[in-house]
């Protein structure tokens, strides 16, 4: 999966199309990412009381994971780009690059 935690992404499909956000968590086995401020849902949780007597629960708004095919990584210029790889000569490791301008992401 070419999208990682900490990347800034642009939503290219769905109800939040055009929104930018930071990837909070990646789920590579499910091919989904959790993006800050995108795909917000209302979750109903049971009201419970903790030991101090404070109540928690009710209707909570939170982000839900979105499929990676619906997002594009934003490169250093602030524009969406496809992600490629190249081999770093010094370290011998794979480095992610922007296919749009060839720079490192």
Swiss-Prot record:
Coiled-coil region: none
Superkingdom per UniProt: Bacteria
One GO term (biological process): translation
Family: Belongs to the universal ribosomal protein uL24 family.
Function of the protein: One of two assembly initiator proteins, it binds directly to the 5'-end of the 23S rRNA, where it nucleates assembly of the 50S subunit. One of the proteins that surrounds the polypeptide exit tunnel on the outside of the subunit.
Stored InterPro entries: KOW (IPR005824), Rib_uL2_dom2 (IPR014722), Ribosomal_uL24 (IPR003256), Ribosomal_uL24_CS (IPR005825), Ribosomal_uL24_KOW (IPR041988), Translation_prot_SH3-like_sf (IPR008991)
Gene3D superfamilies given in the database record: 2.30.30.30
Entry keyword set: Ribonucleoprotein, Ribosomal protein, RNA-binding, rRNA-binding
GO cellular component: ribonucleoprotein complex; ribosome
GO molecular function: rRNA binding; structural constituent of ribosome
Subunit structure, interactors included: Part of the 50S ribosomal subunit.
Protein name: Large ribosomal subunit protein uL24
């Amino acid at each position: 999966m070419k999208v990682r935690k900490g990347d800034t992404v642009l939503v290219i499909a769905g109800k939040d199309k055009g929104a930018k956000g930071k990837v909070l968590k990646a789920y590579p086995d499910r091919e989904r990412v959790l993006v800050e401020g995108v795909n917000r849902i209302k979750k109903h949780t049971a009201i419970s009381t903790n030991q101090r007597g404070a109540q928690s629960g009710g209707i909570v708004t939170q982000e839900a994971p979105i499929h990676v095919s619906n997002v594009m990584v934003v490169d250093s210029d602030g524009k969406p780009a496809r992600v490629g790889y190249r081999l770093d000569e010094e370290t011998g490791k794979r480095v992610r690059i922007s296919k749009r301008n060839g720079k490192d992401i």
